[in-house]
Amino acid sequence: MSHFDRVRDYLTALQDRICNVVETIDGQSHFHQDHWQRTEGGGGRTRLLRDGAVFEQAAIGFSDVCGTHLPPSASVRRPELAGANWRACGVSLVFHPKNPFVPTTHLNVRYFRAEREGKQVAAWFGGGFDLTPFYPFDEDVVHWHTVARDLCAPFGDERYAAHKRWCDEYFVLRHRNETRGVGGLFFDDLDKDFERDFDYQRAVGDGFLDAYFPIVTRRHDTPYGDRERAFQLYRRGRYVEFNLLFDRGTLFGLQSGGRAESILISLPPLVRWEYGYHPLPGSAEARLADYLLPRDWLEESRICE
């Protein structure tokens, strides 16, 4: 089996596993699947769960697409690949829970291959996961980063620190001077050794289940009211801003002629903006600002023990 087919099989199975867990936790709604084909080559399956007991919207898509010319969002970083044939597969998800005390989350794991005259000229892995709470709990953030650190451990002492830092630097709303959330892991252009890099991608994909769903289980029954709901919708606006202005995957998908419905399914179903909003000093809403900057969560928790 080719390298590409092995990755593809893992990713389709990962999508199935995550969907099963989400449906079990939600207990009310189910995913609806949309198979689609891309005129330029390839296709995918988009799955969407809406109006659940736990998840207001949970979107997870698998795609396997190809083309004859790299879009600008990719070739600007790899100018030597301009004009090469390419093929990419990946799983991407964004979950928007109903309860404001359950964080929004994002996962992406992908594999990219470029060929010229029938010969592979480049191939690499990319991906990661990150967490966007509205009412953060230190316990949850430490759990999230503990899972991230532990899954990175077999790949070297520097892996967690490097990919956490990359995540902190990537998921930044520069016009707001704040991070999108409390970070996680981010990596791209991983191309040193296929077997080891593929092992890492699987560790990230598998680790996501251990990192996120215990938080959901812990928080989804937390009581909330109109105030918390309004703040959740306001903060979702930041999510929209990042995805439309800065996210490489969104830009790549749209510039490569991707399926807009599947690409933009990451956006929340409801959102609000408010001009000049500032939370009351000392409020639970104001506390969020302390979390929207790079921090060494595990070291801080160790010191506090």
Curated annotation (Swiss-Prot):
Residues the record marks as active site: 106 (proton donor)
GO molecular function: coproporphyrinogen oxidase activity; metal ion binding; protein homodimerization activity
Enzyme class, broadest EC rank: oxidoreductase
Keyword Cytoplasm: yes
Keywords in alphabetical order: Cytoplasm, Heme biosynthesis, Metal-binding, Oxidoreductase, Porphyrin biosynthesis
UniProt-annotated binding residues for substrate: 92, 108-110, 257-259
InterPro entries for this protein: Coprogen_oxidase_aer, Coprogen_oxidase_aer_sf, Coprogen_oxidase_CS
Location of region: Important for dimerization: 239-274
An example Gene Ontology CC term for this record: cytoplasm
Chemical reaction(s) catalysed: coproporphyrinogen III + O2 + 2 H(+) = protoporphyrinogen IX + 2 CO2 + 2 H2O
Entry's localization field: Cytoplasm
Residues reported in the UniProt entry to bind a divalent metal cation: 96, 106, 145, 175
UniProt xrefs under NCBIfam families: PRK05330.1 (NF003727)
Function: Involved in the heme biosynthesis. Catalyzes the aerobic oxidative decarboxylation of propionate groups of rings A and B of coproporphyrinogen-III to yield the vinyl groups in protoporphyrinogen-IX.
Alphabetical list of HAMAP family matching this protein: Coprogen_oxidas (MF_00333)
Subunit structure: Homodimer.
PANTHER family (alphabetical): COPROPORPHYRINOGEN III OXIDASE, MITOCHONDRIAL, OXYGEN-DEPENDENT COPROPORPHYRINOGEN-III OXIDASE, MITOCHONDRIAL
Protein known as: Oxygen-dependent coproporphyrinogen-III oxidase
Source species: Xylella fastidiosa (strain Temecula1 / ATCC 700964)
Chain's gene name: hemF
